[in-house]
Amino acid sequence: MQDFEKKQLLQKAKNVAILGLSPDESKASNVVARYLIAQGFNVIPIYPRANGEILGRKAYASLQEAFSDEALSECGEIDILNVFRKSEALRAVANEVLRLKNKPKCVWVQLGLFNENAKAICENAGILYEENSCIKLEFERLFSKVD
């Protein structure tokens, strides 16, 4: 995505689901989630071993659960799916996103992670795709105030 597209997406986005949001505060996914919450985003945790809540928010065990009609009735549509999974898992994640009834506008894959197949799957389905890019660092860069 070009900078203007990222900026527009981040300005309009309200709900960010984070796949792989660890309850461990030392993990990058948790640091990013806390930052996004501080910026006013509603973060929806998705973690396979979720047990109740992460960061005071209801945690979901799977994409299907987080993107279900019941879950979305609480928050509305999910704008961005931020993915913290290994590059090898991204194709399966993209295929899973395609099977969702309620799809995100964007799949954002964290810094150091990339998969051409996943990118093609999402883009061919009309879903924005950003990879090898930290949403926290991009938000800071795009919206930092210069004196």
How does the language model describe each region?
Residues 16-19:
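Conserved beta-strand elements of the Class I
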Residues 100-122:
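ADP-ribose/adenylate-binding Rossmann-like module
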